[in-house]
Amino acid sequence: MALRRIYGTETEYGIVHRGVKDSNPISASSFLINAYLSTTSDQGVGPNAPRVGWDFIDETPEIDIRGFAPIGSLPPEIEANLVNAVLTNGSRYYVDHAHPELSTPECLDPLSLLRWDRAGDEIIVKSMKAANEVLPPGEEIIVYKNNSDGKGNSYGCHENYLISREIPFGRIVQHATTHFVTRQIFTGAGKVGSEAVGEKRMETPFQLTQRADFFEEEVGLETTLKRPIINTRDEPHADPLKYR
């Protein structure tokens, strides 16, 4: 019998605030999300809805799947001053550093996940419309579903997998890396030019994937420096004796 799996995605979107002298992506992201929340009549998500509390006490994102943790690693600190909303469809809509991010609800099959992912895109479109209706003349917020901004900054769509601890980690790396790299032939978003360190932008006419320029390691724990193809964060959100 096949194991039933839970699916979900987290998508970071690119954002730009046009028509202002000093564009701040954090402020723009907060404005975008609040504009959407102010237009919805759904109970519990409007402008006067109570904030959702997040308990990170049991989370240890610095524990490495290879069996160690950096000295002094602590549960993450939530940036309580940033917008953080749970929508009525179960999605989480929030500001993550300098991006609007939308996480789907937990789904029980790939088709449901695809539907909720597309619903997230529609929420972004409605958010842009709501934000631009109240901005001063000459200003505009635009959101992009991309993976790099053309200036050396990268962000993306995260995939998280719950796997049995009985499976040797080396076996996972062997097979998963091959899949993650070769699937770009079919699913890569593509981009013109290069953002890799030491390369001239237009010496690379076209790439199949927007994010390849930013990967430096095959395996690792970092998410913003020395980005790996496979991240080794050991945070199962399940029985840690059985899963990772």
Per-region residue spans from a language model:
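Hydrophobic, small-residue-rich alpha-helical packing segments that form membrane-like cores
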Residues: 164, 193-195
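Histidine-centered divalent-metal-coordination microenvironment in nucleic-acid enzymes
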Residues: 147-164
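Acidic, glycine-rich active-site loops and adjacent beta-strand->loop/helix elements
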Residues: 149-150, 212-214
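A short alpha->loop->secondary-structure connector
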Residues: 168-170
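Terminal catalytic/cofactor-binding subdomain
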Residues: 1-144, 174-191, 200-202, 213, ...
